Amino acid sequence: MAHGPRYRVPFRRRREGKTNYRKRLKLLKSGKPRLVVRKSLNHHIAQIIVYDPKGDRTLVSAHTRELIRDFGWKGHCGNTPSAYLLGLLIGYKAKQAGIEEAILDIGLHPPVRGSSVFAVLKGAVDAGLNVPHSPEIFPDEYRIRGEHIAEYAKMLKEQDEEKFRRQFGGYLVKGLDPEKLPEHFEEVKARIIEKFEGEGARE
């Protein structure tokens, strides 16, 4: 282990790989709310957070579990289509709370072009949230709608039905044919839009 008079022990969250303090300071200096996006293997979470000397405050949040509970999502919650839908949801929630703009905070996630964290950003922007970005970082519509998943499911079903049923068992148990994922995506997207832009939302 490094030692000596000039050695400084990093902050605990830096040592644990949870916080990049240099990047965090840059985000805080903007003075804008942060659109914080985090992902695990099976889920995504998005929050609008503002800095407070006593501790960050969460203004609104959304979790992919809400897609299942409130909008009937039957697909996997760790993929690109669900990430986009989560972004759409957090974007509408932010607008409903009077939040018009934010800056993206993906923490220690690598900024890979077309990744699911940027699918969340795409959804939030489509909902009307103003977040500085370059359009080149977004996944294309083919991946956002889950066309790649549907095509893979079709190929796998034709080549090895047993493997197909193992890999897509979660879809099948819920009554969703993975080949119909793009259509299902559009249905859930429409439900989210209807909730926030429909007649009931304006009353």
Swiss-Prot record:
The keyword Chloroplast does not apply. GO terms for cellular component: cytosolic large ribosomal subunit. GO terms for biological process: ribosomal large subunit assembly; translation. SUPFAM superfamilies: Translational machinery components (SSF53137). InterPro entries: Rbsml_uL18_euk. It comes from the Archaea. The keyword Ribosomal protein applies. GO terms for molecular function: 5S rRNA binding; structural constituent of ribosome. Keywords: Ribonucleoprotein, Ribosomal protein, RNA-binding, rRNA-binding. HAMAP family: Ribosomal_uL18_A. This is one of the proteins that bind and probably mediate the attachment of the 5S RNA into the large ribosomal subunit, where it forms part of the central protuberance. Belongs to the universal ribosomal protein uL18 family. Part of the 50S ribosomal subunit. Contacts the 5S and 23S rRNAs. This is Large ribosomal subunit protein uL18. The gene is rpl18.
